[in-house]
Structure formats: structure tokens, C-alpha cells
Amino acid sequence: MKKILLILFINILGINALQASLPDGIREGNIIMGHVIADVTEEDIPYASIYIEETGDGTVSNEDGQFEFRNLPAGKYHLRVSAVGYSTSTKEVVVSKEFTTVIHFKLKVEDVQMDELVVSANRNVVSRRDAPVVVSVASMELFDAVNSLDLAKSLNYITGLRVENNCQNCGFPQVRINGLEGPYSQVLINSRPIVSALSGVYGLEQIPVNMIERVEVVRGGGSALFGANAVGGTVNIITKDPTSNSFSLTSNLACYGGDSWEQSMGANASLVSKDNTYGIALYENYRNRNPYDHDGDGFSELGKVNINTFGMRAFYRPSYTSRLSLEYHTTNELRRGGNKFDLQPHESDITEQTKHVINSGGVTYDKGWRGYKHKLSLFASVQHIDRNSYYGAQRDPNAYGKTDDLTWIAGATYTGQIDNCLFSPSVFTSGIEYQENKLHDIMTGYKRDMKQDVRIASFFAQNEWDMNLFSLLMGLRVDKHNLIDNPIFSPRVNLLFKPSRELQARLTYSTGFRAPQAYDEDLHVTAVGGEGVQIQLADNLKEERSNSFSGSIDWTTKFGHWQANILLEGFYTDLNNVFILEDIGLNADGHAMKERRNGDGARVYGANIDAKIAHGNDISLQVGFTAQQSRYKRAEVWTEVEGEALTTRRMMRTPDYYGYFTLTSSPLKRLALSLTGTYTGSMIVPHYSGYIENDRMETTPDFVDLNLKAAYTFILHDHINLEINAGVQNILDSFQSDLDKGEFRDSGYFYGPTQPRTFFVGIKITK
């Protein structure tokens, strides 16, 4: 009781102080002041997220658990408060013109987070528990636990996802969702498909985690709003939004395999006006990695990387029913793999080198009216990439290249709440998009001058009915692609059954397509047998079509002081006119070629399991596992040896079993421990001649990759925290044992964990 009286007394003093300091022209009303505390202990909860459902406005509580909103129009609002380790709470508040509204939130401890707010389900902010499709979320807590510096090292810890390195020289990464390779999935930045085929080559390693607030993943087609080419799923990168006045500095030093070093530094700052009408978040990241040679042949398995990223995200509110958002980031990267790094690329035996200058930005204007039941969003984004490259072997002076890539997208989205649509209340969403990608790739030595202009005009609409126990979402997307004669119609249907807060069941059907165009791996040249291997498109290449089905059961329960959640998901995808790569030998200019052709079809099906169990902050365990089959409908030719066609029905580089786990614990208030790991099952990988005599298909062993990290936080002056951390990645030193060696190696014959045993130490300063 004394604590409650003390809290009330402090708030009264705070209100009086606020009223005394209000400048002329601002009334004492139109303000919400609040306090967030723990339910049982009544301790302050700092850095809780507070979100106004009607306006989309948000902030975070300060070190004392306090927050405020100013200049709110009088009326009713719903405030949703969430914090790591606590249940989400929503309350209705009434804002008056005459006085300040004071509200208190008491959050109950919740060990398994189920109420995170997500936008990837239907482009509207909803609780993950109420989303019509399964949305997996990777947060900053996960990035810290696995000590990931970039997006590529984070995605392995999301069920159904697996990141692989496809080049022994330059380190070309791609993410597979439910076994489907990278081009089947769509990478979004703040819900915009601005990541082009060229930026997809190395893009997963060019996005530092300190620019990311969270990553939302939808497996399968799911929503009609994000593109029919998202056959495998979507990876939506939500960048940091300014919500409070804060800053952070990080530094990390790592040693790969005992003789190769990597240094990285990052900085973040966020500034928000007291009345929350404007704010800006800034981030910067620098990373330098030396090349690593695992087998001592003088050729790198991990290339040299030097990358610098700077960016910002800002907002301005002309009124409390409108918001203007701006974002921009630039990346400068030098990447090189091969040998003789002290010489020019054409003086080495093998070099794959790229220099990227990337500039990307966007603007969004959001407007709400009629009590925010209707919202309109206008948006435009643009990205330009200037790439200078060298993909060559045997001291080839003509293997230099230059690529210019421009991508832009513009559109509008309308969302309206309907009190009664046919049989229940609903939320209707529709919109239009137009996107264009202009690519010009020149490689004089390979006599390649590729120009590609892709234009897609799209319309989408979907309606979501909420019927208490059921939620039904039906949507349609229409895409007119300039490389396809007829418009593509892609319907989507999602059904959510929610008999209780603890149980949700979902069914999903979606369709999609992939256009006959160049994708990320087509813009990369693999060195095999001392020469570069290119990819060309077949003259009669048709679009690839897909039909996808999925179903899931999501159950949360408590037993004693423990809380658990288990998600079981089944999926099935049928692909027609599936794209395959076939070795076609030398072209007229004597260059080795592969051709992208249409196969008969393929089926990918299987099951995901995602389980979590936690006991407060004491200990938390999360396990994800996937069992699947990826098979062509008939055997497809992948190469010929002495006139004999070699075929396979099994999709290459796709294991039938893979998974991950994360185990975190805080035995002391300031001490955090984490043990994490991934499992990769056996798969088939093509091995082309050069180092070996003839092409052959290899069956790989399985791998277990374990990581350990410890972090301790010191409280410095004026709420400044200093964290010191250290650990080891790939404790077991699981790494490919049959690497090709020398200048005639097949650089594409590379699989397994992407780095050897690595020791690291780091510091972080935050306020």
C-alpha cells in the first residue's frame, strides 16, 4: 500500500512539474502520462513499448518505467503495453482537453512471448497471437544471444530457415525457406520489396543487425499483400524506429580458426521530441574481416570483407492523424576471395572481387480519419547499386565487370474497418503498386552485356472477417509482368480458429509465380577448373507457377512456474515448370555455361516444429526442427559426363532434416549466458571437375554447430550500462573436410557451417 501511495505521490508531483513547465499555446490537457510496473513486485519496468492502436504512435518507458504522449486530440484511445518477459496489456483511456490523463499498467510475468506486434501478416499491426498466418519473429535478444553481426548469421535460428554459403571464394550467401532456394523468397525492408536480384547476391551479409529492430518471417505465400513471387515466404526486415532518447556503442573482436581476425564497430542514436511530433534514429556500422584459409593451400575459404554502413529513419507528424516517415541507408563494401591478396586481381590465380556502393531510401505518408477506422498509406522507395567486379582465374586481365542496378517502387494502400460485412465485422485492405528494376551487367572478358528491364504493375485486395472463434482472410493479387504475356492472378485464403487464448489453429492456401528473368545467382560467376562459369536463360523459358498449402496448431500452457509453447506446422508446395540449372558445356566464345531451363515440376512438403519452455529469466529453451522432402516430379539432368546424362530427382543442397536450439539463462541479474546451435542434415551437392577428374554428385555428412556466450553488465553513472561479453562460435569446429584445393577448385563445392571455430570478445555501452 505504501508503494502505491508513493507512486501516486510521485506522479502527482510529476504532473504538477509538467504543468508548470508547459510553454504558451499548449493546454494542460491532451496529455497521457503513464507508469509501467511489474504485477507482483511492483518494480519499475524500463524500456517497455507503449503503442496507441488508433494512431500507430509509439514510445518506450524510461528507466523509471514512466512514459507520456502529448498533443493528443480529445477522445478514446487504446494503449497496448509490452515488455520482454511480461504479458501484453491493453487499456482504454479517455483524453480530455481540460486535464492530463494518468494511467498505470501492471504487467504479469510471461516467460514465452506470444503477443509481439507484427505487420507481416496483413500489413496492419496485430498481435502475433491473432495474426491470420504464422509469423516468426527474431528480435535483438536473439541477435545478442548468437552474437550475430549481420542478418545472414541470424536467420538460422528461425524455424524452417537455413542460410548457406554457396561460394568458397567470395562467400555468396542465400537463405532457404522450407527447403526452397533464395530466389523463391522475398526479402523486404520495412514491408517494401526493394531488394533486387543484384543486391540479393551478398545482401544478407550487407545488412548489420544494429540497423534492425526485428525480423518477421512468414513461411509460404500467406498474405496477398507482399507479392506473388514470395513462393517460399517473406523475410521482412523492420529497421529501428525512433521511440526514445537513447544511444549505444558496440565493438567486437573475433579470431577465425586461430589466425584470421575480424573487427567490427557499431553506433546507434535515437532522438525524439518531447511531444512526439518528430524523431530520428541513426545507425552506423563498420566491419573488417581478413581472409581465412582453412586447408592451408593458399586460397581463402572465407574472403576479405570491408564494409561500412550508415543510415537513418525519421518521422514527422503534421497532425496526430498523419505521419510522414523518411528512411535512408548507404553501404560501401569491398569483398575479395581467392589468393595473393597483396596483388591486383588479374595478377592472382583466382580472384572474385566486388566493390559495392549502395544507396537506398524511402518515404511514407500515413493518414487516418473517422476515428482512425480508415487509413491511407502512400509510399515510394528507391535503391541504386553501383558494382565493380572481377570474377576471374589464371591471371585473366579481361575478367573485370561493371553493373548498374536501379530499383524503385511506388504505391498506395487503403485499410478500412467495416462494422458489418456480410456476416461479421471485418478489416478491408486494398492497394496498388508499380515497381521497376533496370539492370545493366557488363563483363567484357566473358563477352556479356546483359540488359534487363523488369516492370510489374500490381493490384491487391483482401478482407479479414473476425467472428470471435474464427477469423477468415481472403485475398487476391493481380500482377502484370512485362516478361509474361498475361496477367497473373494469385488468390490467398487463411482461416484462423481460436477457441481460447492458449490455442490457435490455422489453414492457408496460396498461389504464386516466378518470372523468367535473371536472379541473384545469375549475377555471380563461379570459378570451376580455373575458369568462370556463367548462367544464361533458355530462349523459351516460361514462368514457374506454385500452389501452396499449410496448416498449423499453436498451443501455449503453464505448469507450475514454467510456461511452454509448441507450434506444429505442415506444408506442401507444388511447383510447375520448375526452374532447373543444366551444364551445357562451352558457348561459341569458349566460356563454360549453365542454362536455366524449365523442368517438369517439383514437390516440397514436410513439417516444422517450434517449441519453447521458460522459467522466468532463470532459464529459457527454444527448439526448432524441420523434416521435409524436396523432389522433382521426374529425374532432371544436371550435367553430362562422356556423353552420359547425370540426373537427380532430389533437389540439390537441400537436407531432409535441419534445426536449431537456443538456451539462455540469467543466474544473476546482470549476468546473461547463452548456448546456441544448429543442426544440418545430409544432402546432395554437385561437384564439378577441375580439381577432380569428372563431375559427380556428393552426399555430405551432417553437421552440429554449437556456440557459447557470456555477458555481464555494469551500471555506470546516470543510467549508462557497460556490457562486457565473450564466447566461442562453432565450438566443435565443424567444417567441410573435403574442400577442393588450388586454382582449379570448384568454388561452388562448399557446404556446411559458414565459419570455423571462432573466439570473440566485445563491449557495449548503452543509455
Question: Where are the regions that the model predicts?
Answer:
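Short acidic/polar hinge/loop motifs at secondary-structure boundaries
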Residues: 70, 174-176, 192-219, 240, ...
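Gram-negative outer-membrane beta-barrel transporters
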Residues: 466-471, 571-574, 595-688, 764
